[in-house]
Design a protein with these regions (language model features):
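Subset of outer-membrane beta-barrel
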Residues: 5-317
Length: 317
């Protein structure tokens, strides 16, 4: 428990600020709102549940955003709450803005707590029966910790148009190495490294291919995800403000799960659903049932009035 890792998402592309602070403001539109929810291991034990909300906005000089997540795991209700602010800057590398680099920073508060009274210890067994009134003999210095968290990231983008682009980035989190131990001994949280590549290729007027990958490493633990989705545009769609599309994808988390995803885009809205099919050594207990996840996104556009060079005067003037 004391060596716990950071949370993760199967729909990693649909939580962009959590993935890399350089993603702040990197979208078509003016303001972006995102909500995510994940429920996993319900078939094994008390479900692990995570939800997050974020908002980010473009600005003239710097983009900025806010992210908050809440995670609760296990019988002891090990809870993590994090609230952070992000800022990023995009720099054009070519006159036509095809090539660009962005850099970002995330800063905020991380709070962790556990209900130590929910655990049972061997010292509470008197040789005949379990007695919860007996002392645990566990020297908890505290049952909660609040620390400062800091992260940075950078990303390169090649944008041909809205349906053809490549993005690759790297980010580092937990740079303050906060003490997360509940005992007297200091347990430092490991730095988390994220590397991601996202690609979109227009196949024809109706179909897009969207492969991507993400590699994360934190201490001795790492995670590799690879997969792709396809997007089909429904009649009445265009590349600007009216987008109606369906998405379906398959993803693989190495040595852990296969992930099936479905999504729908309608104008300014996106809803994505995914389900993890567990393939790890936990299969006998999980019966291949992993986690359900949902992502909801809304993008707000600031419409500008069209310039009219000529007006037709009424006959009575």
């Amino acid at each position: 428990m004391l060596q716990a890792q950071d949370i993760h998402w199967s729909q990693f592309n649909d939580n962009p600020i959590f993935q890399n602070p350089a993603n702040t403001g990197e979208f078509f539109g003016d303001t972006r709102f995102i909500g995510n929810f994940r429920d996993q291991w319900r078939s094994v034990s008390v479900p692990f549940q995570t939800f997050s909300v974020s908002v980010d906005r473009k600005a003239k000089y710097f983009n900025y955003g806010f992210l908050m997540f809440h995670d609760q795991a296990g019988d002891g209700k090990f809870r993590t709450i994090e609230a952070t602010g992000t800022v990023s800057k995009n720099v054009k590398l070519s006159n036509d803005s095809t090539h660009s680099m962005s850099g970002g920073m995330v800063l905020g508060i991380n709070h962790r707590q556990v209900n130590k009274d929910a655990f049972y210890f061997d010292a509470q067994y008197n040789g005949y029966i379990f007695n919860p009134l007996l002392p645990t003999n566990e020297n908890f210095q505290t049952d909660q910790k609040t620390n400062l968290t800091l992260g940075i990231g950078t990303q390169y983008s090649l944008n041909i148009n809205r349906r053809n682009y490549v993005k690759t980035g790297i980010s580092l989190f937990n740079l303050t190495r906060p003490n997360q131990g509940f005992y007297q001994d200091k347990i430092r949280r490991d730095v988390r490294l994220n590397f991601q590549v996202k690609y979109c290729k227009s196949l024809n007027a109706n179909w897009d291919l969207l492969p991507s990958l993400q590699y994360s490493k934190q201490g001795t633990y790492d995670e590799f995800m690879l997969g792709s989705s396809v997007r089909y545009y429904l009649p009445g769609s265009n590349d600007h403000y009216i987008r109606k599309a369906l998405l379906a994808g398959v993803w693989f988390r190495a040595k852990d799960a296969q992930i099936l995803s479905l999504g729908c885009e309608y104008k300014d809205w996106f809803v994505g659903l995914s389900y993890d099919i567990n393939t790890s050594k936990l299969v006998p207990a999980s019966r291949a049932r992993g986690g359900f996840e949902i992502a909801v996104r809304y993008i707000l556009y600031r419409f500008k009035p069209k310039r009219i060079d000529h007006r037709v005067c009424p006959d009575f003037i």
